[in-house]
Amino acid sequence: MRKRIVHLRGLALAQVPATEAPGVLPGKQQNDIPILEDAYLDWSDGVITGFGTMSELARLESEGYGLGEAPEEVLDGTGRWVLPGFVDSHTHAVFAAPREQEFALRIKGATYQEIAASGGGILNSARALAAKSETQLVDEALPRLEALMRTGTTAIEIKSGYGLSLDSERKMLRVVAELKKHSPLDVRSTYLGLHAVPTDFAGGKAAYTEAALNHWLPRLV
C-alpha cells in the first residue's frame, strides 16, 4: 500500500546527499545530523520511495513532475519527527529478575567484586534464570522489546550469559529464537558463555573456560 506522511516537523537523514552510503558521525559530529523541516515521506510495502520538503513537493507537483502513483493514504505528521531506526547492539533483554538492590549498594560504594562475593551480580541472575521456564522468560521479555520499539529501536542484539551452564545457556538462546518469531524487531543473538565463572564449577576458571568454548559452543551453533 502506497502511503505518504506530510508536514513532518522534522525528517532526520542518515547522510547527505542521500545517495551516499551512510557514514559514521562520532563525537560532536553527532550534532550535525542533517534534518529536513516541514517534510514529507513516501513509502510502499515497507520501502521508502521518496522524501523531501513540502515546498519541494509543491514545486514538483506544480511543474507537473510525477512522483509515481498517487498515495493511497496520506497521514498528517504535524508536530512529529521521523528518524532512522536505532540499532541497540548490546543488551541483556532476557533476564529473570532485576537487581536494583545491587544498584543501591553500588551507590553506597560497594564494588562489583564485593557484591558478587556476597552472592549477587551475574551469579544471582543465573540462579533466578535457572528457576524460570522458557515460556515465562519469553512472556517477560516481549514487553521490553515493545518498549524499545516505541522509542525508535528497530534492531536489537540479545546476549545469553545468565545461564552459566550448558542447559541454561541453551535455554536463553532458545528464548531469543522465540522472541524473533513474535517481535517485529530485527533480533540477533550472542552466546556469552564466559560472562562469569560459577563458584561451584569443578576445576575453576580454567576448566569452565575449556567447557564453555570447546564443549558447549560447538553444541550451540
Which positions does each model-derived feature cover?
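Intrinsically disordered, low-complexity coil segments
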Residues: 21-23, 58-75, 202-203, 209-210
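N-terminal metal-binding scaffold of metallo-dependent hydrolase/deaminase domains
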Residues: 1-65
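Conserved beta-strand scaffold positions in the cores of enzyme catalytic domains, especially
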Residues: 5-7, 13, 72-76, 189
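Metal-associated gating/positioning segment near the N- to mid-region
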Residues: 65-140
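Metal-coordinating catalytic core of metallo-dependent amide/deamination hydrolases
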Residues: 125-140, 146, 154-221
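Divalent metal-coordination and catalytic microenvironments
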Residues: 41, 46, 79, 90, ...
